[in-house]
């Protein structure tokens, strides 16, 4: 199995991407995006696991994230969309395998929106994101109960980034109709409740699948590996 760091030129920023090449490819490609204030390292365990099961994975850093290697500034959600869209285009140059977008938290929203905008994307995986997040973040901020880790990001803070995200869901999620999407909630998630994930799932078109895993918010990607693999195996049985 191989691991290569590449750089992809998006319209707004250059994007650092780790490419996980499987030893025995199964004709499935995944483009993966991390959550706010994190980096591609947060999804490394999940990506390496999927690589070991034959998937080619592109795991990238969103711009403006100081723990990552992309640099630049995160000016708004359009920068997230631009980054993942550029990585999808780069991944397609390597072959025509069915391609899925995958993400955790902020990356999950991005994965859903990018897939919705591109009907040639086979489907998506959304881990630990849900409907109604702006209201939940406002409550957490007012209570002083959470640090949104804005110091780890050059650019917009999380509440500002997500302030109109529900309108985005209303616009884009219906466009996923006919393509499979996996929605994963974590039972100990203090940032995105399972009820919020379930509401997003209930609003989404078919085909879709909902899974509840044992995890907190931060490590939901790692702990979702079994559910993600099972979902992929159902769609693409190994010979």
Q: Across the structure, where does each feature detected by a protein language model lie?
A:
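Short alpha-helix in the alpha/beta-hydrolase fold that links the catalytic acid
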Residues: 193-201
């Amino acid at each position: 199995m191989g691991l290569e760091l590449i750089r992809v030129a998006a319209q707004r920023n250059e994007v650092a991407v780790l490419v996980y090449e499987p030893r025995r490819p199964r004709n499935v490609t995944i483009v993966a995006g991390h959550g706010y204030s994190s980096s591609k390292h947060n999804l490394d365990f999940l990506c390496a696991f999927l690589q070991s099961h034959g998937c080619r994975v592109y795991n990238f850093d969103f711009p403006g994230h100081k723990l990552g290697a992309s640099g630049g500034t995160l000016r708004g959600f359009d920068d997230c969309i631009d980054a993942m869209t550029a990585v999808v285009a780069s991944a397609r140059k390597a072959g025509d395998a069915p391609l899925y977008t995958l993400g955790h938290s902020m990356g999950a929203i991005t994965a859903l929106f990018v897939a919705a905008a591109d009907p040639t994307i086979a489907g998506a995986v959304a881990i630990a994101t849900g409907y109604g997040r702006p209201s939940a973040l406002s409550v957490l901020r007012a209570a002083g109960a959470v640090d949104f880790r804005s110091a780890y990001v050059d650019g917009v803070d999380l509440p500002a980034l997500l302030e109109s995200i529900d309108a985005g869901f209303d616009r884009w999620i219906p466009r996923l109709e006919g393509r499979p999407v996996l929605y994963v909630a974590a039972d100990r998630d203090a940032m995105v409740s399972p009820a919020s994930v379930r509401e997003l799932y209930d609003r989404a078109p078919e085909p879709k699948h909902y899974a509840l895993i044992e995890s907190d918010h931060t490590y939901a990607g790692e702990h979702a590996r079994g559910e993600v693999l099972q979902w992929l195996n159902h769609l693409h049985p190994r010979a």
